[in-house]
Structures are given as C-alpha cells and as structure tokens.
Amino acid sequence: MLKAYERLDHTHGEIVDSITLDQDTRKKARIKGTTDGGADIGIFMERGHPLLVGEILKTECGVFVEIKGEAEPVSTAIATDWLTFCKVCYHLGNRHTSLQIGELWLRFKPDHVLEALAEKYGLSIDKTPAVFEPESGAYGGKGGHSHAHSDNISNDKHSHAHAH
C-alpha cells in the first residue's frame, strides 16, 4: 500500500498516478482508497487542511500522486449581472453554507431552500454534476482558490502544483 504523508509545493518529478475524490472525502485527514491507477493508498494529512484539487502528494516510497476532483451532485446558480450576483452571494454567505464562487456563477451542495433563494433573484440553476471546490472561508488559511483560469464554469485545470 502506498502511504502519503507529505504535500508538495511543486515537483519536477513525474506524477505517476492520481486519486479522484469528492469534496467530503478531500476534507478528511485520513483517507484509505484506491488510486486511479489501481494502487491501494493511505493518505495521512494534518487535520483542518482539506486536500485541494491539483495538489501533489509524495508517498513514503517517492511516488507522486495528484489529487483530482470527482464530479458530484451540485447546484450551480448562474447570474446575468454583477449586482444581482453580489446580492445572492451576500445572502447565501449569511447562511454560512459552503460556496464555490466563479465569474457570475456560484456552486453549492443541492439544497432546495438555497436554490429557491437564487431563483427568487433571477438566477438559473444548473444541476449538472461537477467538481465542488468551495471557498475555505475568511479564516480558513490554506486553499480556497481554484486552479482554473477560465471565465466560464469549466473545471479544466493546468498541470502544475502550487504552494498552499
């Protein structure tokens, strides 16, 4: 079994495997799973610092494993103007719910109350499963940013790791 205890800022070594995890699993400090290549892996990280999509883990035997996000049920609320978008972000933020924020779109776990609030302000709701990468919060420290560089709601990532 591979065992990973270390996150890397970057690597010049070859990333030989990956593991695809949903958001709830990425929040866990101890994960036992199977890599996308079929290897058993144990991930042992510090508590309170979720794994981020695009991060690289180094196993104790020197193998580099990339964290990938699994598409999961989400609601993506899409706005057509910035003022309305800001108002909805404000109201949903006051509910202390996990949100992923993009340009004129925000994403949250399916919740009919939150969907109704967004629709009340004229946002459309897209329920297509997607990778969920919520903001870490004002005091969250690590994470909270996307590695995507697109203005749309795509989850395409670039291939190098960042310091977190």
PLM regions with names:
Residues 49-52, 65, 106, 124:
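Small-residue-biased structural context
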Residues 34-42, 46, 102-103:
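Short, structured beta-strand/loop micro-motifs enriched in basic residues and often containing a Trp
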Residues 45, 51, 57-59:
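Short, well-ordered loop/turn sites that connect or cap secondary structure elements
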Residues 66-79:
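Short glycine-/aliphatic-rich beta-strand segments at the starts of folded cytosolic domains
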Residues 42, 75, 105-109:
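A generic structural motif
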Residues 1-25, 101-102:
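Extended boundary segments
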Residues 81-128:
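Conserved, well-structured core segments that form or line functional sites
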Residues 1-13, 109, 114-164:
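Helix-rich terminal scaffold detector
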